[in-house]
């Protein structure tokens, strides 16, 4: 398969690896970007955290509520300047009202919804003309809780990051603290037992190849033990329950929750552009 300059550019943006390394990775994986990323990680050229990449656009994430339902949505613009514009802010408000009133739970339904004799998609095109930048709706998500459960939220930088937490009971101060922690610490999973087995197996495979390369003179049993230790540390960093609480690094999140007689049922962390 021919490796094009565009393919190399795409892989470099995702991994920050060098041009030669990206070209080789693409050759080895027959042009498959995702497999090329894994190839680079196995070679130790990039770190796991870089796989997710960075935000590439501006805009706002927001959360609106209706009883036991919460709706998250993200609207994008090309620049931060426009996202702070009065017209853009009003658009965010209007879309939130439409979502709530009509209980719209995905972007497709919202874009097709008829509002004041035009679809929301047409409304976005109008705003694009007014603001001089491409304005898009990226995503919508509905989260429903049980009556005895409670919502907690935290917004950072006016909506660059929005976090929604569901606690098993009503603990306003705790839910706000946990939401703030999630915004700062970026957990990928709730608890170790909630980690996707496929993800775990892939991570272990990559760690094993990296470790075997670093310690090629060590016996297989020792390498396996080191891999298990590294995997355990990685899970502690990724799982909300195991992370050091942002307000008290000597206390794990799960211990903070236990001390307050509550627990996290679920959470959503959205970062604008990701």
Curated annotation (Swiss-Prot):
Q: Which GO terms describe its molecular function?
A: translation elongation factor activity
Protein biosynthesis: present as a keyword of the record? yes
What GO cellular component entries does it have?
A: cytoplasm
Pfam families from the entry?
EF_TS (PF00889)
Q: Where is this region: Involved in Mg(2+) ion dislocation from EF-Tu?
A: 79-82
Give the UniProt subcellular location, in the record's own words. Cytoplasm
The record's SUPFAM superfamilies line, in alphabetical order, gives: Elongation factor Ts (EF-Ts), dimerisation domain, UBA-like
Keywords noted in UniProt: Cytoplasm, Elongation factor, Protein biosynthesis
PANTHER family, alphabetically? ELONGATION FACTOR TS, ELONGATION FACTOR TS, MITOCHONDRIAL
Q: Which family does it belong to?
A: Belongs to the EF-Ts family.
The entry's function note states:
Associates with the EF-Tu.GDP complex and induces the exchange of GDP to GTP. It remains bound to the aminoacyl-tRNA.EF-Tu.GTP complex up to the GTP hydrolysis stage on the ribosome.
Q: What is this protein called?
A: Elongation factor Ts
Q: Which gene encodes it?
A: tsf
